[in-house]
């Protein structure tokens, strides 16, 4: 993904303030609530019957944290997102059969979560930079799809 030096500084500066467990659980939880068809990939997570159940589900929180840890790896390797996400792309494509559109949806939800937590610090320039990053990550995760 191509970011200017200013965009990279915005992304890395804000990412350093991300509370991975909290924001990750919230982002994945919101995805599962707003786009309920994505729940089919999480059958083993137990109770996803309501928004409260999803948002309080410890497996959702744990997997959300894992997702954001991977996102952090991507942010450290913005010039090689495809390489960084190669194994995860393979896993989600070949074994889990996740619709790659879900990566885009989660990226957009994550941007909303960041905006909610960072308020005024999440400037229009920061949002634009993060939109580029989540689009790049979604494309990298979709790379192994045929």
From Swiss-Prot:
Binding annotation for heme b: 63, 92
Positions where N-acetylvaline occurs in the chain: 1
Key words of the record: Acetylation, Heme, Iron, Metal-binding, Oxygen transport, Phosphoprotein, S-nitrosylation, Transport
InterPro entries: Globin (IPR000971), Globin-like_sf (IPR009050), Globin/Proto (IPR012292), Hemoglobin_b (IPR002337), Hemoglobin_oxygen_transport (IPR050056)
Modification sites for N6-acetyllysine: 59, 82, 144
Membrane-spanning residues: none
Pfam family of the protein (one): Globin
GO biological process: hydrogen peroxide catabolic process
SUPFAM superfamilies: Globin-like
Modified residues (Phosphothreonine): 12
Listed GO MF terms: haptoglobin binding; heme binding; hemoglobin alpha binding; metal ion binding; organic acid binding; oxygen binding; oxygen carrier activity; peroxidase activity
Residue ranges of every copy of the Globin domain listed in the record: 2-146
Residue numbers of S-nitrosocysteine PTMs: 93
Subunit composition and interactions: Heterotetramer of two alpha chains and two beta chains.
Family: Belongs to the globin family.
Protein name: Hemoglobin subunit beta
Biological source species: Erinaceus europaeus
């Amino acid at each position: 993904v191509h970011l200017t030096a200013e965009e990279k500084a915005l992304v890395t500066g804000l990412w350093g303030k991300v509370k991975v467990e909290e924001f990750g659980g919230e982002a994945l939880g919101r995805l599962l609530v707003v786009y309920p068809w994505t729940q089919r990939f999480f059958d083993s997570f137990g109770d996803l019957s309501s928004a409260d159940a999803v948002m309080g589900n410890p497996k959702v929180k744990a997997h959300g944290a894992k997702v954001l840890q991977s996102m952090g790896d991507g942010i450290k390797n913005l010039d090689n997102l495809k390489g960084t996400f190669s194994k995860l792309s393979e896993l989600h494509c070949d074994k889990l059969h996740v619709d790659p559109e879900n990566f885009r949806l989660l990226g957009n939800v994550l941007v909303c979560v960041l905006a909610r937590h960072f308020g005024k610090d999440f400037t229009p320039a920061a949002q634009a930079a993060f939109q580029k990053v989540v689009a790049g990550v979604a494309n990298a995760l979709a790379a192994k799809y045929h």
